[in-house]
């Protein structure tokens, strides 16, 4: 079935749907990972985005339950050069087309993904529409222009949980948290309050491996309830959308950093930046992929990192805050810490999924910060 992709500037490509009849829109981006398509599809941070895979053959190893990063698919669409219909992998339980159809998400192959990637690299990520129903590019261009821009758009409410939950036995578990915030911890690790703005499950796995007992809570979980919970630290998760729009969450973080040790990844890092007086700017085409070089300024160590963000933190000489990590491709900020408060954060994804594990040590670094804070 023919599918037409049209960007807001009129750039047009023709492909073929491998998931049936549809029309959908969103911000069109590209990711440079050769693998990890299932993790990308199920990462809530990709909510509202149509993802172009730069590697030409996608779906070779199928899909499986173990590679899920949430309970569903959040990408608006998957754009590939060629989709493999018959995977070869002993772990696979479903082909990529079957997986996409199960979650009712569009997939398109036969696109010139190289041309699309070059266009986005030169002109920036932009809104687009892909349709099997409308054949007039001018009509689809107007529809693309009518879509909300990512800048200024709060997408967290679409992916955040409505009530608290725990993570153990490698799964989400229902729990009861009292009205005042008090909670009966299981005693399996250091109590950690996790603000879920659209978290990846592998972050929760890595927190457990680092010796934490995570309790995930919705974005509206108040500082008073956080204090009453008995948690020894706070973790702020990844998530979609423009961080500058999350004014109530920024105010929340501003209080939390004076109560407990705090760390964050991706959107959580950006919220910490805002709370400390920094600002965020939108990147031209974002950082999406498993091969971004980062330098840890505290050790001089170079890491290859997994990244997925369209915004970045700009410090602008913020008092008492220093950079800890920098991206070696474009020199943008990848990590920060407060000089006196037990606060640190990272823009990239040390939990990987998919990607290299060079940054896993940072979960233990935060645990050490909590220990030092408790002993102070």
Swiss-Prot record:
Q: What SUPFAM superfamilies does the entry give?
A: Carbamoyl phosphate synthetase, small subunit N-terminal domain, Class I glutamine amidotransferase-like
Q: Which reaction does it catalyse?
A: hydrogencarbonate + L-glutamine + 2 ATP + H2O = carbamoyl phosphate + L-glutamate + 2 ADP + phosphate + 2 H(+)
Keyword ATP-binding attached? yes
EC no.? 6.3.5.5
Q: How does this polypeptide assemble, per the annotation?
A: Composed of two chains; the small (or glutamine) chain promotes the hydrolysis of glutamine to ammonia, which is used by the large (or ammonia) chain to synthesize carbamoyl phosphate. Tetramer of heterodimers (alpha,beta)4.
Function of the protein: Small subunit of the glutamine-dependent carbamoyl phosphate synthetase (CPSase). CPSase catalyzes the formation of carbamoyl phosphate from the ammonia moiety of glutamine, carbonate, and phosphate donated by ATP, constituting the first step of 2 biosynthetic pathways, one leading to arginine and/or urea and the other to pyrimidine nucleotides. The small subunit (glutamine amidotransferase) binds and cleaves glutamine to supply the large subunit with the substrate ammonia.
Give the protein name, as stated in the record: Carbamoyl phosphate synthase small chain
Organism whose genome encodes this protein: Desulfovibrio desulfuricans (strain ATCC 27774 / DSM 6949 / MB)
Gene name as annotated: carA
